[in-house]
Amino acid sequence: MNASGKAVIAFSVVGQDFFPSAGFASLDAVNGAGAIVISAPGALPDYGFTGYVPFGFRSARWGDYSRAVADESGAIWLGNEFIPNGPRDILANWGTFITMVNP
């Protein structure tokens, strides 16, 4: 939330029509939640190699790398996980997308 009371929530968008993508929605006390915005569309499925050992790697780690912070100008910066179409290593294919929003 910035000093004007405007907020943005960062999240992943995944579904039948979406590979893991970076998304956000604006929030404010007057209008409530805004529309979902895809800031970076995912290009590929999650390979699942970054699974949790206690679960036998059956459950891939996902969604624990989203962040939002307001700067002194009122802009809100977001960092989200998504699956880009680019270089990957042997254990993971996710990337980070940074978005600046002026709510």
Regions found by a protein language model. Give the residues of each.
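C-terminal PAP-associated
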Residues: M1-P103
